[in-house]
Amino acid sequence: MKNKKWISLAAAVILAVTALPMTAFAAEKDGGEEKLTKVTLNEVAHSIFYAPQYVAIEEGYFSEEGLDLTLITGFGADKVLTALISGEADIGFMGAEASIYAYQEGATDPVVNFAQLTQRAGNFLVAREEMPDFKWEDLKGRKVLGGRKGGMPEMVFEYILKKNGLDPEKDLSIDQSIDFGATAAAFTGDDSADFTVEFEPSATALEKQGAGYVVASLGVDSGYVPYTSYSARTSYMEKNPDIMQKFTNALQKGMDYVQSHTPEEIAEVIEPQFPETDLDTITAIVKRYYDQDTWKSNLIFEKESFELLEDILEDAGELKERTPYAELVNTEFAQNAS
């Protein structure tokens, strides 16, 4: 009887001792999961155009890299830039032209671009009537709801007009007074406008309502353009190189997913990001962007792309002087991630 008691006691001790490392390991693991580093990302708009970013969020790639990402939509590059400069955002996602403007104004802590997501414009020209044989010269004498002066949507639009022999100031009327994201509503409520320049899902929504028809893709007609990129203040990048690398790694995983999956698969992953849009519409939009080669295979912001951007700014009269590529672009994190 005593032997049985001793054996039971010994077994209990062995179990307790064996369990200690496992308990400690579990606590360490739990503790590790709780120690995700918080990062705030301010995006210029919430659009299917940025699908690789939402894939990275929905697939948990940021968490895998140890980051707790908070996503805020700024509704305009000017607002994203303000959030970056004020410190409300750690990382911004917008057109790189905003960083050039800030640099031109003598920013003491320059906003530097470190990853390029899109390589084409993501907006479309929507007409009030069906125009299967549309040509850019059809805009002569017509009214178009455009974008903010100095913003990428408007500058790329004007870049295309000039490529097709049109003078944006003389050959047509461009309304630049409407806030970003409000042009589709303005188009349905203002019969005086013949065309509007829209991102998705607004372009497809207008088509579904029978209120407009996509007649041209600015992304196709402008050619490859460094449309949107990720940026951060120089001081933040210098203090947090690990965070910058982890963030870029997560994005690259999203890029890899998009390159290796179908539009249908991509749409299913990002569907939770767009609760007001049905899956069929999301799929159609993803396919539209997919087919026109919207997303890069890597995040490296090449010098040639930066110089093309400056050409567009110069052509639009928005560039005081050309900025050295090395001053506003850092490719270290993107190269490491690719």
Locations of regions flagged by a protein language model:
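Short, low-complexity disordered leader/linker segments with a strong preference
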Residues: 1-38, 335-338
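Pocket-lining segment of extracytoplasmic ligand-binding domains
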Residues: 129, 181-274
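Short amphipathic alpha-helical segments at helix boundaries and their inter-helical linkers
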Residues: 89-93, 290-303, 333-338
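Predominant activation on well-ordered alpha-helical scaffold segments within soluble catalytic domains
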Residues: 54, 100, 158, 204, ...
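Soluble non-cytosolic domains of exported or imported proteins
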Residues: 47, 74-78, 93, 151-152, ...
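Short, glycine-/small- and polar/acidic-enriched structural segments
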Residues: 29-177, 186, 194-200, 211, ...
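C-terminal solvent-exposed extensions
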Residues: 308-338
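Secondary-structure end/capping motifs
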Residues: 238-320
